[in-house]
Swiss-Prot record:
Gene3D superfamilies linked: Helix hairpin bin, yfbu gene product, domain 2
Biological classification of the source: Bacteria, Pseudomonadati, Pseudomonadota, Gammaproteobacteria, Vibrionales
Database matches in HAMAP family: UPF0304
NCBIfam families: PRK05445.1
Protein family according to the UniProt entry: Belongs to the UPF0304 family.
Record's protein name: UPF0304 protein VIBHAR_01542
Pfam families, sorted: YfbU
Length: 166
């Protein structure tokens, strides 16, 4: 993150004020203030992590992934008991993304569910959409398979299995 000296001074003052307003997090704000004041470039990258950017294309891809899971869950509900028995029910749960490598995607999913109220049927589980393993490539393969299905919102057990194994 490139900042002018004036910007660094303003941010330093804000961290100083935050440390006074929020004593329980004072050590955190003092640390960030020191990083900004002294210009530690490596640590200043930490400041960037909260100011990510997801393109419109990436946002639409995440929504498509969530919509695919919604379609799979709804399709599963429409199956008769025999067909439903062939579907691994655990794989119908949307796990989210890996917070370590796909943080922006995790935050966007949380925004969609928590702030926008979309997909309330998705179980946040204990990890709140942190799959704890990279998922984006897997989801992309699943999306490709799902998009090739003729009836995307009325999938049979075989189609669900194909999507899961993509």
């Amino acid at each position: 993150m490139e900042m002018s000296n004036a910007q660094r001074l303003i941010l330093s003052n804000q961290y100083n004020l935050m440390s006074q307003l929020d004593p329980s997090n004072a050590a955190k704000y003092k640390r960030l203030q020191t990083i900004v004041e002294r210009g530690y470039e490596l640590q200043m990258r930490e400041l960037n992590k909260d100011f990510g950017c997801i393109t419109e294309t990436e946002c639409r891809e995440i929504i498509d992934i969530m919509e695919m899971y919604h379609a799979m869950q709804e399709s599963n509900k429409m199956l008769d008991d025999e067909e439903r028995g062939k579907v691994d029910q655990r794989r119908l749960q949307f796990l989210g993304f890996d917070i370590a490598t796909e943080a922006q995607q995790v935050h966007y999913v949380r925004f969609l569910v928590d702030s926008e109220g979309l997909y309330p049927q998705f179980d946040k589980a204990d990890h709140h959409f942190n799959s704890q393993m990279p998922m984006l490539d897997k989801y992309r393969r699943m999306l490709k398979t799902w998009r090739n299905c003729p009836r995307q919102y009325h999938l049979c057990a075989n189609e669900l299995a194909q999507i899961f194994s993509a």
